[in-house]
């Protein structure tokens, strides 16, 4: 077989995303990006920054990585090492600048964390997904991303059946008197209508409704008998400002959900009032919010699914404990009686440490289902943890 010339049309036609090869205990992965403007003679592109969640991002405090051009071609490439269980999202950020980061990012033993974060914050709105990779979507921060999964990455229940038929969700407008705002809420049901159906409240509902629709996965697992017939309520965050205000330990948000939203939903799709049949699920600030709901209203929210919960809040980067950790230590709150699934990624150090700290406090009061995943602060990891967590929390309801 004749070797294809790097950068030729036939060479590009043979590519369908990153390429991996086994290398001792790990995999060596090569990323490719095709410069639409051609070679260095015709293109103004100086850098193609690679943002791999949990590897080259600000959560790892890693120095920014750029693909390098293969001279006299339209080919840019970068190679890195990944564990066999790794799963995560990535994107490219082509730039006409030689450097888009402050000097402090490249000086000293460690990049300056704030300068690194600020550099990525400015670049990410310009991110593009991998045109060679069919598995692409718009991430939670609004920019395009693509998927990379190693051969031994954990199974993600339900997500391998994207063509499963499902009942169309109903999208309503919730006008909140208490919060003085309005937002979309999706109501999704599986199985036959019954007042005994369990309830799941999913935070960041717009993501699970639109960016990475969860409906086929839930329908598939219900059809297989791995989830009970249920009512799912997906709550939109409105925007970043509302999310940052309403999700971190905000009593008004949860009072509005209980006093206003749930009665409205119940009139359309009856569900059980039992706390031990009710799940609150969230990621990042949503993970923090879900445990906050359970600790403060255990009579209503008895099952908590927290993924990459921001338990450092409100002290980002500080050495002191977050609010919920402090309250548990002081005995101001108790987790007794709650069923809790707690999950965090190895590649999100600040979040992982905060989760380990709150796990230590929760464990003294209550058994906790703890899961540490080989990934970062990443919806591609969360989607499997979401369905697995629902299966775990509702296991007693499966006949």
Where are these regions (language model features)?
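Active-site nucleophile loop of the alpha/beta-hydrolase fold
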Residues: 205, 237, 305-314, 346
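Cap/lid segment of the alpha/beta-hydrolase catalytic domain
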Residues: 201-268
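Alpha/beta-hydrolase fold nucleophile elbow
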Residues: 271-284, 304
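A conserved short beta-strand
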Residues: 228-231, 299-311
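Short glycine-enriched nucleophile-adjacent loop
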Residues: 287-298
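Aromatic-rich carbohydrate-binding modules that target alpha-glucans
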Residues: 2, 24-85, 95-160
């Amino acid at each position: 077989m004749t070797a294809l010339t790097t950068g030729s049309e036939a060479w590009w036609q043979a590519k369908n995303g990153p390429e991996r090869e086994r290398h001792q205990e790990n995999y060596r992965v090569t990323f490719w990006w095709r410069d639409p403007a051609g070679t260095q003679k015709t293109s103004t592109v100086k850098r193609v920054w690679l943002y791999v969640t949990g590897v080259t991002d600000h959560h790892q405090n890693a120095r920014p990585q750029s693909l390098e051009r293969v001279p006299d071609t339209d080919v840019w490439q970068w190679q890195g090492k990944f564990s066999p269980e790794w799963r995560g999202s990535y994107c490219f950020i082509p730039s006409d600048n030689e450097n888009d980061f402050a000097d402090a990012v490249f000086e000293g033993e460690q990049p300056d964390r704030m300068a690194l974060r600020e550099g990525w914050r400015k670049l990410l709105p310009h991110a593009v997904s991998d045109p060679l990779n069919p598995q692409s979507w718009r991430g939670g921060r609004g920019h395009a991303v693509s998927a990379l999964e190693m051969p031994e990455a954990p199974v993600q229940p339900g997500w391998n059946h994207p063509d499963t038929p499902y009942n169309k969700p109903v999208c309503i407008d919730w006008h909140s008197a208490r919060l003085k705002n309005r937002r979309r809420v999706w109501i999704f049901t599986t199985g036959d209508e019954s007042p005994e159906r369990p309830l799941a409240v999913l935070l960041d509902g717009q993501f699970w409704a639109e960016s990475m629709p969860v409906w086929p996965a839930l329908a598939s697992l219900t059809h297989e008998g791995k989830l009970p017939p249920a009512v799912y309520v997906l709550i939109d965050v409105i925007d970043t400002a509302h999310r940052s205000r309403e999700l971190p330990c905000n009593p008004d948000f949860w009072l509005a959900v209980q006093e206003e939203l749930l009665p409205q939903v119940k009139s359309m799709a009856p569900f059980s009032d039992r706390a031990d049949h009710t799940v609150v699920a969230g990621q990042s600030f949503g993970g923090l919010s879900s445990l906050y709901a359970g600790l403060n209203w255990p009579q209503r929210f008895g099952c908590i699914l927290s993924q990459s919960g921001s338990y450092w809040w409100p002290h980002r980067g500080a050495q002191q404990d977050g609010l919920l950790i402090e309250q548990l230590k002081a005995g101001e709150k108790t987790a007794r009686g709650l069923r809790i699934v707690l999950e965090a990624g190895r590649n999100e150090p600040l979040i992982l440490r905060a989760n380990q700290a709150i796990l230590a406090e929760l464990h003294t009061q209550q058994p906790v289902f703890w899961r540490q995943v080989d990934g970062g602060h990443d919806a591609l990891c969360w989607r499997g943890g979401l369905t697995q967590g629902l299966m775990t929390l509702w296991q007693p309801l499966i006949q």
